[in-house]
Amino acid sequence: IDRDQLNEAFWLGVGSPGSVAPAPGTIYSPGAEWNKKWGVLDLKQANDLLDKVGLSKKDSDGYRLRADGKGRLRLEMVTVGGQFVPYTQIGEMVKQQWKKIGIDVDIKELERNLAFTRDNNNENQLITWANDGSEVLFLFPRHALPVDAAESHMGMAYARWYASRGASGKKPDDAEMLRAFDLFRE
């Protein structure tokens, strides 16, 4: 994602493009390098990562093909209309940016309650939402780690597993996520 382009277009250049990490200057900041990690546009790295996970084949329009051979890889990005941030327009710009790496995106604007109900039912592939509050990780952890079974916008099955201490949901198979869960619980 070209966060600088988004910043210029939607925040008139006054934002601070970066990653989901507590802001520098807060006691929770893991260090300035984390505010840019995975948040800087690098088309070569993006293409290399997509190729590495088995998405190296493309159709005649340059879009990546699914690894299972069932045609073009197409993602649905849910946006919430009528909010304080123009999520749908941001989604459209990201769609154009991802075209450069061969990712096809359908933008689907939904009413907020429906979008969040779909989130809770683990029915969204992607959803756009604000990242406000991530500078205080313990107040708004859901922006960085799926620990809130009611309001995480990512990994709801993982959030349910974490919140229920393994009684429901799905245990992540990623060791780093499990370690992050352990550290957060401490």
Predicted regions and their residues:
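Short, well-ordered beta-strand elements
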Residues: 72-82, 105-106
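Alpha-to-beta junction loops
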Residues: 93-97, 103-104, 121-129
